[in-house]
Amino acid sequence: MIRLRVKEVAKEKGFSQGRLSRVANIDENTLKRIYRDPFAIITTETLDKLARALGVPSSELIEDVPDK
């Protein structure tokens, strides 16, 4: 199972949710959903936009967690 680490990385980089939404040019509601649900399904395009905005490789925004 893949877990998104967007919220954690954004916090480490000093990004508020609103600022990240603007810089990444993604809908604020999409980002809210990602923040609420780290297992949300997103497009690779959205993942790439978030990674570029945060200045990290996209691989840093995902984590493989074992199924329970």
Model-assigned labels for residue ranges:
Residues 11, 25, 36-39, 66:
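Residue-level detection of the helix-turn-helix DNA-binding "recognition helix"
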Residues 8, 62-68:
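Short, charged recognition helix plus adjacent turn
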Residues 45-60:
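DNA major-groove recognition helix of helix-turn-helix/homeodomain DNA-binding modules
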Residues 1-14, 18:
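A short, Lys/Arg-rich alpha-helix, primarily the initiator
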Residues 15-33:
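Short alpha-helical DNA-recognition segment
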Residues 1, 12, 39-42, 53:
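Helix-turn-helix/winged-helix DNA-binding modules
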Residues 10, 21, 51:
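The alpha-helix within a helix-turn-helix
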